[in-house]
Amino acid sequence: MTLGRVLSIVLSCLLIHATPTLALTDKEIIAQLRSPENSTGNIADAVETVTGHRGWMSADMKPLFDVKIVGKAVTALMTRGLKTDNREYPPYHLQILDTAEPGSILVYVMEDGLNVAAIGNLMATTAQIRELEGIVIDGAARDITAIRAIQFPVFTRRVSPATSVGRMIPVAKQIAVMCGGVLVNPDDFIVGDPDGVVVIPHDAAEAVLKLLAEYDQKESKMMPIIKREKSILKAI
């Protein structure tokens, strides 16, 4: 083998190892998270392993009907307060509803407002028409019979007939918020299913997906053993 040929092979190897792995697009990440194998249970385990922090929201954060949602967060914060002055409060909670990209998940946080509804049928219908993925509320929802009838995904900690109008003041939009005990930044990935809601920090998503693939492979090997041996201990 000539020296030129050797150098060519070495150079090729160096180029292969130097070529960075192409990052997944957000759409590709969402598509993988949508897989039935990727439940919020496994995702919660993966997020905690990758980040060292809890990613699952409060156990009382539940869907109005069984559904799975996956998308990127668009946030709004409201706080308790009566409008007793002449100041104008921008309707941030409505602005994000009218401007969020299709496929987004709205995250509404009602500070000290668990007993008042952040949304009802009108807002849910608007979200559905705008092709949003769903709404997550650290607070309450109302008109749930109508929302169930149109089958728009809403995850909420409580249900209440009380309106937020006159009780809650819009504070900000597209900021970091604490929702269900978990930090949510705009564009973080949100996954909700009948078990609850999990937040995946945007920059941790690919590492989480890699771990989820390992979980799936491991569980796929365990299930036949469980069925054959009728034992969980033998499968572990």
Sequence positions of predicted segments:
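General beta-strand structural signal in soluble alpha/beta enzymes
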Residues: 55-58, 78, 107-109, 117, ...
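Intrinsically disordered, low-complexity regions enriched in acidic/Ser/Thr/Pro/Gln residues
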Residues: 23-88, 98, 218, 224-232
